[in-house]
């Protein structure tokens, strides 16, 4: 159909959710950006005849990049440069709610930022940055239309899925203290991780539809009589449940590609343009 925007889906894998075999006709592409190199090579290919670009792990192929040191700007810029209209990400997270059990999926709709050391904008006045200052609206950080697709697919597949949740992103790489975990619950956070911020913010600045499939692996450390979060426990739960996130991705991508996103993408582009304050000459 003339005038309909062609969909290309970027995929960012999280801890334990980084299988490049989901793509057909894979081609590795090493790229550079004005902000440096992304976490790993991009893998170009198709999922059910839909063009996709996979960044298999934001932490690097051997999980050598701490959450603080992930080059989020390069990752998002690289996917934008490849023409991605959407970014679907997977992330491990801790649950801050009794009802979100380990192994459950959460389609996140909000975030709380507790990071302290990360570049959060493409417009910060540096030599590689875009001109001006971008005051991007963040009332609805995640793409509602994309989230609806993911929620619908999860229900159809019979996967236990929470249709919303506020993700609090901490700096890491350490896990929370018990006092912090209890405080985050009082703040209204539902799940906790180390990577959603600034990824979701940068995607918004790039005018890309961004949605996150979060998998709860543990109860962090707030819950009495429950084993506190540990690397071993996170990886064990991921190994047992990673197929849930993969199934949602593989089923959702062709449905996303069949929809018309022209109006929404144009609206997002206009929002970015209206959010940038340029210097007066």
From Swiss-Prot:
Substrate binds at residues 194, 218-220. It is an enzyme of class 2 (transferase). The keyword Glycosyltransferase applies. The keyword GTP-binding does not apply. Phosphate binds at residues 15, 58-59, 91-92, 195. It catalyses: S-methyl-5'-thioadenosine + phosphate = 5-(methylsulfanyl)-alpha-D-ribose 1-phosphate + adenine. It holds the Pfam family PNP_UDP_1. Catalyzes the reversible phosphorylation of S-methyl-5'-thioadenosine (MTA) to adenine and 5-methylthioribose-1-phosphate. Involved in the breakdown of MTA, a major by-product of polyamine biosynthesis. Responsible for the first step in the methionine salvage pathway after MTA has been generated from S-adenosylmethionine. Has broad substrate specificity with 6-aminopurine nucleosides as preferred substrates. Homotrimer. HAMAP family: MTAP. This is S-methyl-5'-thioadenosine phosphorylase. The lineage of its organism: Eukaryota, Metazoa, Chordata, Craniata, Vertebrata.
């Amino acid at each position: 159909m003339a005038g309909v925007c062609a969909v290309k889906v970027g995929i960012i894998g999280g801890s334990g959710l980084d299988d490049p075999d989901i793509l057909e006709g894979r081609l590795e592409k090493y790229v550079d950006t004005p902000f440096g190199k992304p976490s790993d090579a991009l893998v170009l290919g198709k999922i059910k005849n839909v063009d996709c670009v996979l960044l298999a792990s934001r932490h690097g192929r051997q999980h050598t990049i701490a959450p603080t040191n992930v080059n989020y700007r390069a990752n998002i810029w690289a996917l934008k440069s490849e023409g991605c209209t959407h970014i679907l990400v997977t992330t491990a997270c801790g649950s801050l709610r009794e009802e979100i059990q380990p192994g459950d999926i959460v389609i996140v709709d909000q975030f709380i930022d507790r990071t302290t050391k990360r570049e959060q904008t493409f417009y910060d006045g540096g030599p590689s940055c875009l001109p001006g200052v971008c005051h991007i609206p963040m009332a609805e950080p995640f793409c509602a239309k994309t989230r609806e697709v993911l929620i619908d697919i999860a229900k159809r597949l019979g996967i236990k899925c929470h249709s919303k949740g506020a993700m609090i992103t901490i700096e890491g790489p350490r896990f929370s203290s018990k006092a912090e975990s209890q405080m985050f619950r009082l703040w209204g956070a539902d799940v906790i991780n180390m990577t959603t911020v600034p990824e979701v913010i940068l995607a918004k600045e790039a005018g890309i539809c961004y949605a996150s499939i979060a998998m709860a692996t543990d109860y962090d450390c707030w819950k009495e009589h429950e084993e506190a979060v540990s690397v071993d426990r996170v990886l064990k739960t991921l190994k047992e449940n990673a197929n849930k996130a993969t199934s949602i991705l593989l089923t959702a991508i062709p449905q996303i590609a069949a929809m018309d996103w022209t109006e929404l993408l144009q609206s997002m582009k206009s929002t970015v343009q209206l959010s940038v304050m340029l210097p007066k000459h």
